[in-house]
Amino acid sequence: MSWQAYVDDHLMCDIEGHEGHRLTAAAIVGHDGSVWAQSATFPQFKPEEMNGIMTDFNEPGHLAPTGLHLGGTKYMVIQGEAGAVIRGKKGSGGITIKKTGQALVCGIYEEPVTPGQCNMVVERLGDYLVEQGL
């Protein structure tokens, strides 16, 4: 399966039991910041934004004072899982980023999608990739 198929079929799909509800944007990005696959709506990000995210995975709490920035949008960092998941909130939407052995699985949402639904979609694919050694 191509990386784009993972984005299209597993991240940008309808959320179980909620037809028509889906993430607004998603991507799979290598630890080096290279985009493996993304939705057409995923924001173009700066290398320093991805560097900040990777630093937070290695040094949990790094982004808390400044917020998580992606594509020029600032998200308030909320509880995640140190070294594994970063979650951010902005208004009625937010972001979930799951770190795997080689990549970051990113999902961005707006209402009516809930933070929990975004977490489920992103982390389920991330956990699968971890199980596959990716």
Swiss-Prot record:
Pfam families: Profilin (PF00235). Disulfide bonds join 13-118. One of its GO terms (molecular function) is actin monomer binding. Keywords: Actin-binding, Allergen, Cytoplasm, Cytoskeleton, Disulfide bond, Phosphoprotein. Phosphorylated by MAP kinases. It is found in: Cytoplasm, Cytoskeleton. GO terms for cellular component: cell cortex; cytoskeleton. InterPro entries: PFN, PFN_euk, PFN_sf, Profilin_CS. A motif (Involved in PIP2 interaction) lies at residues 84-100. The modification Phosphothreonine is found at residue 114. It comes from the Eukaryota. The variability of the residues taking part of IgE-binding epitopes might be responsible of the difference in cross-reactivity among olive pollen cultivars, and between distantly related pollen species, leading to a variable range of allergy reactions among atopic patients. Belongs to the profilin family. Binds to actin and affects the structure of the cytoskeleton. At high concentrations, profilin prevents the polymerization of actin, whereas it enhances it at low concentrations. Occurs in many kinds of cells as a complex with monomeric actin in a 1:1 ratio. This is Profilin-2. The lineage of its organism: Eukaryota, Viridiplantae, Streptophyta, Embryophyta, Tracheophyta.
